[in-house]
Swiss-Prot record:
The keyword S-adenosyl-L-methionine applies. Signal peptide: none annotated. It is an enzyme of class 2 (transferase). The gene is rsmJ. Specifically methylates the guanosine in position 1516 of 16S rRNA. Keywords: Cytoplasm, Methyltransferase, rRNA processing, S-adenosyl-L-methionine, Transferase. S-adenosyl-L-methionine binds at residues 108-109, 124-125, 178. It is found in: Cytoplasm. InterPro entries: 16SrRNA_methylTrfase_J, SAM-dependent_MTases_sf. This is Ribosomal RNA small subunit methyltransferase J. GO terms for molecular function: rRNA (guanine-N2-)-methyltransferase activity.
Length: 263
């Protein structure tokens, strides 16, 4: 992963101070601002937002909100037959594999899998992104509706668990990876504003190839890697099968068939 930039967290009011300290302590974030800050996190009425202070164009703060936008619509209108990710992970009407999302990001793919009925444990290596995701999950989980119920099947467990192999509440059937991949030319122009901010903060996963082996070791049945159609195989390793969509493909590394004994 690209070196983490310094991003301070601030409270919008005195009432938020205790909560801000708890977030900062959990994710190792500083309180002090500097004149060189590129990003700042602000907690306002319980909502954590990332502000890009030096953005080339005016951008709204980045917030993880599972009740808004295309993610909410997609989760509520997902059909197994239309979801390439479901086919790759192995979701059926009768079988909902447990999943570890080792590169959770803003939680969007994990949210789709949870909407399909999977229990998903999330790992996000960037502490600022993890803090945003954690805040979004906790807010959503308080709501007694489909979105809230979906988010209850999502659990953010930490930042480095894929490499330590610890902290999981259950052994995952599937490990899912979607490492950041450098975009160039036309691809950059097509990236939406919220993802522009995300990519500026996180950069590309320069060590992405190192994720595959621990993922294979952890998964009970398979590892699924999401890649742009033009991208090479992760770690140069050819998958057992592929599921392709318009812009992406899902490379599937199979250890054994579902329900097949490990012995």
């Amino acid at each position: 992963m690209t070196t983490t930039a310094r991003v301070p967290i601030l409270a919008d009011s005195d009432a938020e101070t205790v909560a801000v300290k708890a977030i900062a302590e959990r994710w190792g974030l500083p309180f002090e601002t500097t004149d060189n800050d590129v990003f700042q996190l602000w907690l306002t009425e319980g909502v954590l937002a990332l502000h890009w202070l030096q953005s080339p164009q005016k951008m709204s703060p980045l917030v993880v909100d599972f009740h808004q936008g295309k993610a909410a619509y997609r989760a509520q209108n997902t059909q197994l037959k239309n979801e390439a990710i479901a086919k790759a992970v192995g979701v059926t009407g009768q079988f909902k594999p447990s999943v570890v999302d080792g590169t959770a990001g803003l939680g969007r793919d994990a949210f789709v899998l949870a909407g399909l009925g999977c229990n998903v444990q999330l790992i996000e290596r960037h502490p600022v992104v993890a803090a945003l995701l954690d805040n979004g999950l906790h807010r959503a989980q308080k709501e007694h509706d489909f979105i809230g119920d979906t988010c209850l099947r999502m659990q953010l467990i930490g930042t480095d668990n894929l490499f330590t192999g610890s902290g999981y509440t259950q052994e995952p059937d599937v490990v899912y990876l979607d490492p950041m991949y450098p975009k160039t030319g036309k691809q950059k122009a097509q990236v939406k504003k919220d993802m522009q901010m995300f990519q500026q903060l996180v950069g590309s996963d320069e060590d992405a190839d190192t994720l595959l082996e621990p993922a294979i070791a952890l998964a009970k049945y398979r590892v699924v890697v999401k890649r742009p159609n033009s991208a090479p195989f992760l770690a140069g390793r050819e998958p057992n099968s592929q599921i392709k969509s318009k812009k992406h493909r899902f490379d599937v590394y199979i250890k054994r068939g579902f329900h097949e004994s490990a012995n």
